[in-house]
Each structure stands twice: as C-alpha cells, then as structure tokens.
C-alpha cells in the first residue's frame, strides 16, 4: 500500500525515514460541479422555472467518473508518473434536497469511486476538496445548494433581470443549443469570476463569514445565518467523511485518503470595502456589466440603474459605453408569499425583524429609499475594516476553526489543508491551537495574461501575484518582457507565494499548489483544427519550470472525463482539461512499448543498467509498484500505459524526483534539449549506501537505450517497467544530469552538445 506521508522539519513531504517525496497529480474531475441526472451543464438553457423547482431532485452519481471507466482513467494518470488526486465534491451534491437531507446514495457512490481508484495498481494518494466557485450553480458557479440562497432571502429566478448574477445557461439559444451573439457581446471569456462582485455571491459570502457582525437581524431557527450556513456546510462535509470511514475504513488505513482541504477559493464578499458607491481601485477584474455595490443593492430591489461596462483590450480592461438595466418590477428577493412557502418547506422560522421582499442591507440601515422613490446610501463604509488583514485573520479564522475542530475530532493523523482566498497569504496562525504538524497550506495559481486572454503571450507578462498583493509602487513595474523573463517571473511568483505562506504559518508547514493550470482553448481553439498545441505546451512548460525549481507539489486543474472541443469542461466555457476524448484519435504513440536496451557506446558518459521487475532490483516506492498480489510477469501499470487523449503531452509528462534519499536543492527539466538536472543533499549514513533516490524518467522524452547520464557520485539502475531511475549516491551535495542523446548527433566526449559537469559516476 502507499506509504504514509510525513512532514519534515523544514516543511517538505517525506517518508518515515525523512526521505523527501513529491506529490504530482490532477484535480479529478470538474464534472462534479454539475448534476449527472438530469445532465445540467452550464450550456443547458434555462427555458422555464423547472431549473429551480427541480433543483432538489437532481443526482450527481457518475460525476466525477462512471464506475466502469475508472481503471482506464487512473492508468492514464499513472502513465504520467502521477501519484496524487484532488477529488472535488460540492455541497450541493451531498445536500441538495434540503438542510440535513443527505444524498447517501451519492456518498456511497463516492466510496465506490475511492475504492476502485485504490484498487488500480496500488492506487493513488487522494485528498478531498469541498469545491465551490462564486458560491453556487445558481449564482453562476458551483458549490452550495439552491436552498442556501433561499435561506438568505434571495429569489434566484430573478437574478438575470436584476444582474445579481450572470449564468452561462441564460446565454444559450434553446433552439440551436449555441451561445447567443458573439462571444464578447454575450458571455465573454472568463466572465464568470465577475460574479464575485455581484449581489448574490458577495452577499452570500458576507453572510457566511460575517453574518453575525453585518447582518445580526438575519437569524433562522434561533441561529444567525452565519452560524447556520457554516454549521450545515461543515456537517455535510463531515457526514461524507464519516460515511467513507463507515463503509470503507481501509481507505484510511491504506493511506489512500490523506486529507481534507478547507473551502475552495473562499471570498470575503463585501467585507473590507471602504466605499460601496465606487468600484474598489484594487479590483483588477472588470469585465462586462460592472455595478458598484450600491448599484447592486438598487438593482436587487428592482430599481433601474445605469452602470458601467468594461471590455477586454490588449492593455487590460477598458471602460466602454454605460448600459441601463431595468428589472421591470422584478426583485432579487423573495416576496412574502414566496418566502412563506419556502420557510414552510424547510421548517425555517426567521427573526420577525427580517422582512421579506426587501434587501437585507437596506434592512440593516446601509441604504434607504427616501420620499418613496430616491435611493440614498447612508453608510458607504459599512463593511470597512482597519486594514486588509482583518478578514483573513478574523472572519476566515473563525470559519476555519470550526472545520478544523470537527475534522480533528474525526481524525488526528490526516492532513488538513488550509486554503486562503486566491492569490492571498494565509492567516497568521503561528503558535495557534488550530495549527498542528499535519497542516498543509494550499495555493492556487493561474497566470493572469494566459487566463484572461486565452493565449500564450511570449512578449508581455504580468506579475499577477505581486500586483494583487501591492508589491509594486506602480503597476507598470509588474510588467515583464520576453518569454524567458515571463517564465522566470512565474517561477518567482510561486516562490513568493511559498515564502509568504511560510511567513504566516511557519517553515514547518508545506505549501501545496492544489490548483494550477492553463486553458487549452487558446487562440480561438486553433489547436483543435491544426492539432498544433505549441502554445499550450509552452504555457504548461512555463508552469512546470516554475514548480520544479522550488520542489513544489501540485495537482493540475484538471482532468475532465467529459471534456469536448465544443464545450470544454462543460462548465462556464472553461477548457482546462489535460485530457479529452476528442483528442484520442489524434495520438499515435510510437514509444509506448518498453524499448530493448542497447549497449551504450564507451565514453566518459555513464552507461545505465536497465532492469525489469523480474530482475530482483530495488523497487520504486510503494505507490508505483504493482499490486503485491499481481503476478510480476503480468504487465505493470506503465506497460499498460495509455497516453492517447492527452493534450500538450510534452509539457505534462515530466521527469521528477519521486523520492529523494536526502534533501531537495534544485531541479530543472529543459524540454527543448530533453535534459533534466537534479541537485540534492544526500543523507549522511554510516552504512554502505543501499537506499537510492528514485527519479521518474519517462520514455516519452528519454529512450532508455539512449540515456546520457552524468552525476557527482554513485551508480544507478534504470527500471524499464516503471520508468524509474534508481540513483545510489554519496552523502552531501550531489547532482545528476540526464539527457536524451540525439540520434543524429550522439553525445560523444568533447562534443559541443555535452554539458561538462565536475565528476563522473560509477557505472552499475
């Protein structure tokens, strides 16, 4: 079974003996954001109220994966050398029928998914992700069930009329099934995150994190809505965890499930806004209809407003022609009659001061309608805070304390993964009771230029993290020029994120990039016609370059089993999947079979002894071994490898140190010249060296018979079954460089193509 993961004194993942390990994998699978029955992708048009009326009757079974297909998907991931899965699930999938009404059939399906993953070639490490985007599917994203919006007094059926949220579903022609109008006129690229700045999402997050402070009148069944929502959310998560342990305790005992992440990409809502009558200067994303908070309040009450519109330009977001929105009598809030019916259905009893058919921020005196018609903002600074850290160090910590305590009551040894808001440092928890030695910090990173423009710009890049965190006196200083500098800038950003996280949580807490990736529908989906994924390859290689330089573990966003060239990941026009069934016919693998070893020419370049599982050589770490009960004469996972359907495979398939007998110092894979450099500090041991460093060396880049290896010390064995190099090196500072020798220009001594490194290795 997979070995238990430990954390070293300097915050690195390691085994029980202190040998550092690296976690690499994917998010599997974004289909969990949408129901499977009925299949309700975001390109399913909303034609009538059944979208809302039947929301409590949906089922998510078969999302993330159809059970019978699990083995083939996991073998594909193992073909990349991956050992880790981030398994998202949504609150809606667990509790869509109503508060406390759990879908145990779906939970049991998840148990079966986990069990089947664990049975495939020794399984994978898996951690659970309570996923959300802009609060809910009904506010333009994914996550919370519909009843949470009703709980806040919202009428989601009127979000379109009041601009309280933008849903992709409203921009689909029911007759043609296609989007209405041109992309930038109807549903612009990456417009869905603007919901974070619209009435529905901002209100829900404000209530979730700060309801007791900002909405004291909003109590339900004797609880403030903050406690009510957090309690239901945490209970749903822990009910799933308990169900897994009840039905399949071996998933925990075998180190298959390694931990739980806190809420995906939490948001502060209105908390911290200093003036509700203006768009905050620090807001970098302005696209499409962009109301101020006060304008959102008015629109939610059915009041006509003229608001700013922004469009995407080469130089950023530019203000365009204002537009007037007339809700035509519709409100974003439940009428008295509607709310009475909802409250009766869910057995809710509200505070008598909580009036229906009215904005809750008007209810709390933030604004009012004077003389029966004129809206007036009374408290523009109602949500302001003394400094920008108040939310993360107070409101967020209050929430995190709740889930931390519940999870630690459930299990003391599993990892708990704390995730702060996107591109922001975590709270300062040093010396806190809710920071223990099984805590990990989650970071997410997407290159701003690549994400928003869906292209790989080799000329201009932006230090997104530095810009968001005000590390520049002038935004112009965040601009970088040239592809090499852009790559270095991304590496610097990831390093800064790690540094900032450790400054808040301490050096002993590992940093794990639980989401990082690129859009594949670049350049208006040109690659889907030409099969030229060079832009995607360059963008992904830049991320790989950045991650491996700092020994950062990661799970790419994402692997989507239902991806298509037309609709991408079937959610809000996102297309991040590294694999697509539509790309399977385009792949012809000429390197899938294990090559027959050839003797290396005599030279100062070290030769490599190859072995198979029959040879009795030292085996790779447990999570890439074949099952103990599997006949070793049978094909191993890598010999079954299936690389068809992967996009930008050259950049995804990378060498990396699976387990280091010592401590990591530096690594770099050069995709252009097919070379890999690893520097480490070998562990000092009094005995003869018997424990190697294991390095995944994929045949896709490195044909075993043409490996050129130089190192500072030691000898090696290459296991062709597993594509793993076992390097037995000396203690202290060591390096190894592995190159793929060109057929046309063999790497002979003294040639221009060789890299002269200080020492030769012992030939095994």
Swiss-Prot record:
Its main location: cytoplasm. The modification Phosphothreonine is found at residue 594. One of its GO terms (molecular function) is steryl-beta-glucosidase activity. This is Ergosteryl-beta-glucosidase. Ergosteryl beta-glucosidase involved in the ergosteryl beta-glucoside (EG) catabolic pathway and vacuole formation via hydrolysis of EG to generate glucose. Is also able to hydrolyze cholesteryl beta-glucoside and sitosteryl beta-glucoside to generate glucose; and C6-7-nitro-2,1,3-benzoxadiazole (NBD)-GlcCer to generate C6-NBD-ceramide (Cer). Keywords: Cytoplasm, Glycosidase, Hydrolase, Membrane, Phosphoprotein, Vacuole. GO terms for cellular component: cytoplasm; cytosol; fungal-type vacuole membrane. It is found in: Cytoplasm, Cytosol; Vacuole membrane. Residues 601-622 have a biased composition (Low complexity). It catalyses: ergosteryl 3-beta-D-glucoside + H2O = ergosterol + D-glucose. Its EC number is 3.2.1.-. Belongs to the glycosyl hydrolase 5 (cellulase A) family. GO terms for biological process: ergosteryl 3-beta-D-glucoside catabolic process; polysaccharide catabolic process. It is a peripheral membrane protein. The keyword Cytoplasm applies. The active site is at 515 (nucleophile). Signal peptide: none annotated. Disruption phenotype: Resulted in the accumulation of ergosteryl beta-glucoside (EG) and fragmentation of vacuoles. Residues 588-629 are annotated as: Disordered. Coiled coil: none annotated. It comes from the Eukaryota. Present with 1070 molecules/cell in log phase SD medium.
């Amino acid at each position: 079974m997979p070995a238990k993961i430990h954390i070293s004194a300097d915050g690195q993942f390691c085994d029980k003996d202190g040998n550092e390990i690296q976690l690499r994998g994917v998010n599997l699978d974004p289909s969990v954001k949408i129901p499977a029955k009925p299949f309700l992708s975001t390109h399913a048009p909303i034609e009538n109220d059944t979208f809302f009326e039947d929301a409590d009757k949906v089922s998510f079974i078969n999302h993330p994966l159809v059970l019978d297909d699990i083995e083939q998907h996991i073998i594909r991931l193992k073909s990349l050398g991956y050992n880790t899965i981030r398994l998202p699930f949504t609150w809606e999938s667990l509790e869509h029928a109503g508060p406390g009404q759990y879908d145990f059939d779906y939970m049991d399906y998840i148990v079966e998914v986990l069990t089947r993953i664990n049975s495939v070639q020794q399984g994978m490490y898996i951690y659970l992700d309570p996923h959300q985007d802009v609060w809910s599917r009904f506010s333009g994203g994914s996550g919370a069930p519909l009843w949470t919006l009703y709980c806040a007094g919202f009428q989601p059926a009127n979000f379109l009329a009041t601009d309280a949220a933008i849903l992709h579903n409203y921009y689909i022609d029911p007759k043609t099934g296609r989007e209405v109008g041109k992309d930038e006129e109807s549903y612009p690229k990456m417009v869905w995150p603007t919901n974070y700045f619209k009435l529905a999402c901002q209100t829900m997050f404000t209530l979730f994190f700060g309801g007791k402070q900002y909405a004291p009148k909003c109590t339900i069944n004797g609880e403030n809505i903050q406690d009510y929502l957090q309690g239901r959310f945490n209970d749903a998560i822990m009910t799933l965890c308990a169900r897994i342990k009840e039905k399949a305790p071996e998933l925990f005992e075998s180190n298959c499930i390694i931990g739980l992440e806190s809420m995906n990409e939490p948001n502060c809502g209105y908390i911290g806004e200093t003036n509700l009558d203006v768009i905050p200067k620090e807001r970098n994303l302005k696209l499409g209809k962009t109301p101020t908070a006060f304008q959102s309040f008015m629109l939610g009450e059915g009041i006509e407003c003229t608001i700013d519109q922004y469009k995407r330009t080469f130089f950023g977001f530019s203000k365009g022609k204002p537009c007037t929105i007339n809700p035509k009598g519709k409100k974003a809030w439940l009428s008295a009659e509607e709310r009475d019916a909802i409250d009766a259905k869910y057995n809710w009893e509200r505070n008598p001061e909580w009036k229906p058919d009215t904005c809750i921020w008007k209810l709390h005196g933030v604004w009012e309608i004077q003389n029966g018609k004129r809206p007036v903002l009374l408290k523009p600074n109602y949500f302001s805070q003394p400094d920008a850290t108040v939310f993360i160090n107070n409101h967020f910590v209050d929430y995190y304390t709740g889930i931390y305590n519940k999870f630690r009551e459930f299990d003391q040894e599993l990892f708990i993964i704390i995730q702060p808001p996107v591109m922001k440092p975590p709270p300062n928890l040093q010396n806190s009771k809710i920071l223990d030695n099984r805590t990990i910090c989650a970071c997410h990173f997407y290159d701003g230029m690549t994400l928003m423009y869906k292209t790989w710009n080799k000329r201009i890049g932006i230090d997104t993290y530095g810009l968001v965190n005000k590390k520049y006196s002038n935004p112009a200083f965040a601009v970088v020029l040239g592809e090499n500098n852009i790559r270095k800038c991304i590496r610097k950003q990831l390093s800064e994120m790690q540094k900032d996280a450790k400054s808040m949580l301490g050096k002993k807490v590992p940093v794990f990039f639980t989401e990082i990736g690129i859009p594949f529908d670049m350049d208006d989906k040109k690659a889907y016609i030409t099969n030229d994924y060079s832009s995607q390859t360059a963008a992904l290689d830049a991320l790989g370059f950045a991650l491996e330089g700092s020994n950062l573990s990661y799970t790419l966003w994402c692997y989507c089993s239902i991806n298509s060239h037309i609709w991408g990941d079937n959610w809000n026009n996102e297309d991040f999947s590294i694999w697509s069934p539509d790309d399977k016919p385009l792949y012809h693998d000429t390197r899938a079979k294990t090559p027959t070893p050839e003797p290396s020419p005599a030279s100062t370049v070290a030769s490599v002894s190859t072995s198979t599982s029959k040879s009795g050589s030292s085996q790779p770490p447990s999570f890439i071994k074949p099952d103990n009960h599997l006949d070793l004469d049978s094909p191993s996972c890598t010999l079954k490898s299936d690389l068809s359907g992967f996009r930008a495979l050259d950049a995804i398939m990378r060498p990396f140190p699976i387990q280091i007998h010592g401590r990591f110092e530096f690594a770099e894979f050069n995709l252009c010249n097919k070379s890999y450099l690893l520097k480490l500090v070998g562990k000092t041991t009094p005995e003869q060296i018997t424990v190697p460093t294991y390095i995944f060396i994929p045949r896709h880049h490195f044909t075993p018979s043409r490996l050129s290896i130089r190192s500072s010390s030691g000898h090696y064995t290459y296991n062709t079954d597993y594509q793993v190099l076992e390097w037995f090196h000396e203690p202290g500072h060591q390096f190894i460089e592995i190159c793929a020798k060109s057929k046309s220009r063999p790497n002979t001594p003294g040639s221009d193509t060789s890299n002269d490194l200080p020492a030769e290795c012992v030939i095994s």
